[in-house]
Design a protein with these regions (language model features):
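Conserved structural core of kinase catalytic domains
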Residues: 17-51
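Catalytic-loop of the protein kinase fold
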Residues: 69-86
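Conserved C-terminal C-lobe helix
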Residues: 171-185
Length: 206
């Protein structure tokens, strides 16, 4: 486990996930285990009549949380819906098992295919922009209350590289420019950092 002391904030980056029930049987982890409380998913069930301001705020806080990690010099590497958690009304980003330094990425493709940016299927390294693409998929599935479907790694590659077509419910069309910037298939056309996405969201809110 790496502990970062930056900006008076402690970030714990665990690199091994173990079952809670086995902790007592593994003395080598004594004093080095991070126990997470039971939490709710940040991106929960969404009603199309839900207040747009509340939706905007949830998206904004998720972007800010990801920006904090990037500013510390890390790529999350496995952004997915389940890793944004709500605890005591606060947002937490969890599960840093696949986190990589921005300055020294590696070519290992160990992300979840549902959320993989197109370039990762072609062997590219994970980047800030692949994190952004994954967040775009999270937001797309949340706003549409649907799940993308594929039956194999190859089908996921075809979906992300060729077939993905972003269409939002009429009540959430205001967020289409944000999702378009997050989900561009060509990396050079995607938002280059989280702050570009935040600025886009702010413009949509004015």
């Amino acid at each position: 486990m790496k502990i970062l002391h930056i900006k008076k904030t402690n970030w714990l980056l665990p690199f091994k996930i173990i079952e809670g029930s086995t902790v007592s049987q593994q003395p080598q982890f004594q004093g080095r285990v991070l126990v997470l409380p039971d939490t709710d998913c940040w991106f929960d069930v969404l009603d199309q009549k839900q207040n747009l301001k509340n939706i905007d705020e949830k998206i904004y806080l998720a972007l800010v949380k990801l920006a904090e990690l990037h500013e510390l010099g890390w790529i999350h590497g496995d952004i997915k819906k389940e890793h944004f958690r709500k605890f005591k009304q606060e947002l937490y980003l969890i599960d840093f098992e696949k986190t990589r330094l921005i300055s020294s990425p590696d070519p290992i493709t160990d992300a979840t295919p549902r959320y993989m940016a197109p370039e990762l299927f072609h062997g590219a390294n994970k980047t800030v922009q692949s994190d952004l693409y994954a967040l775009g998929i999270v937001l797309y599935e949340w706003l549409t209350q649907t799940r993308l479907q594929a039956n194999s790694y190859h089908e996921w590659a075809v979906l992300h590289c060729q077939k993905l077509n972003v269409v939002l419910p009429s009540s959430f069309q205001v967020f289409l420019p944000l999702l378009s910037g997050l989900l561009q298939k060509q990396q050079q056309n995607r938002f280059s950092n989280v702050h570009e996405a935040i600025n886009c969201l702010k413009m949509l809110s004015t």
